[in-house]
Amino acid sequence: MSKILVISGHPNLPDSTANKTVLDAVKNHFGDAINMRELDKLYVNGKFDVPAEQKALAEADIVVLQFPVYWYSVPGLLKQWIDDVFEYGFAYGSQATALRGKKLLISATAGAPENMYRDALPYELTTTY
């Protein structure tokens, strides 16, 4: 079986509904076959344990980034993790091989009132001058 690494990028997972539900379903389905990394618990004293995070990535066959969409982007906590962990020489560069051949899955949640999910937006996003 493939080794699956799930990165939870929610900055406050205990107060989440959708993200917590997704992660609970993944845990129940895959059990011990996954390595679940909850970034809100791993970000201690303003930093990540970069070698430990890189080791988890290197050992995985499949990497899942699970997060809520905030302002059309990932939460700041996940952005910080990406910036810290995906270093030159590890994640990119001519000598970087740690992530080669791995599969990436993005699992993103978004929330808005029901009336926002329709064909036409409730307001114009662009203006012609």
Name the predicted role of every residue range.
Residues 5-7, 35-37, 105-107:
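Hydrophobic/aromatic beta-strand patches that form the interior of the parallel beta-sheet core
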Residues 51-129:
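Helix-loop-strand module that forms the ligand-binding subsite of alpha/beta enzymes
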Residues 43-51:
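Structural motif
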Residues 17-21, 48, 76-80:
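Generic recognition of short, well-ordered alpha-helical segments
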Residues 32-44:
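A short beta-strand-loop structural module common to alpha/beta enzyme folds
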Residues 1-33:
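N-terminal beta1-alpha1 ligand-phosphate binding loop
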